[in-house]
Amino acid sequence: MLPAYLTLISIPLGLVGTILYIRDMYRGTARPNRVSFFLWSLAPMIGVAIAFGEGARWSLVPVFMAGFSPFVVLLFSFIIKQGYWKLKAFDYLCGIFSVVALVLWLIIDVPILAFVFALVADLFASIPTIVKAWKHPESESAFIYLLPGIGHIVNLFVITNWAITEYGFSIYILVANTILVLGIYQHRIWKKKSTLV
């Protein structure tokens, strides 16, 4: 087991990933889906507040950064003229389902059910960007998904209380970010595979 303070590595990793994503927004190569980024900033912050109240500490650093980074990107999407993705009905529908799951998460007094609804809320928030990454990989930048993943991996090595509410969100974010990165790099990955065959 690693020392708990190593979770602090997620702060510089998250900041670098965010800065590189914003740089790509200025270049026009990253256009965030505002529904995803708004809900990605909201759900982790609520989760941090709840888990902090239940005694979690160091394991919350990467989760906090999972909310802080999208919040910064969301703010910049209103500043940078070309820095956002045009929303469609599907995006709003996913947003509504995510908000419903967030509300259920907040009103349910059973920690494991609340945790499930938190993941469902984040999943619905992620779907529009996952679809966008796979259909339009040129509209996404992988840094904001790759670098924070390292912080979540470290987080799994510092957890002392192996309750699902402690480690589940980090595992979920690793899976979701991997799907996003594969979508963004799909043409490069598949092209290399086909040349090797």
What do the PLM-derived regions correspond to, one by one?
Residues 1-197:
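Alpha-helical membrane-protein topology signature
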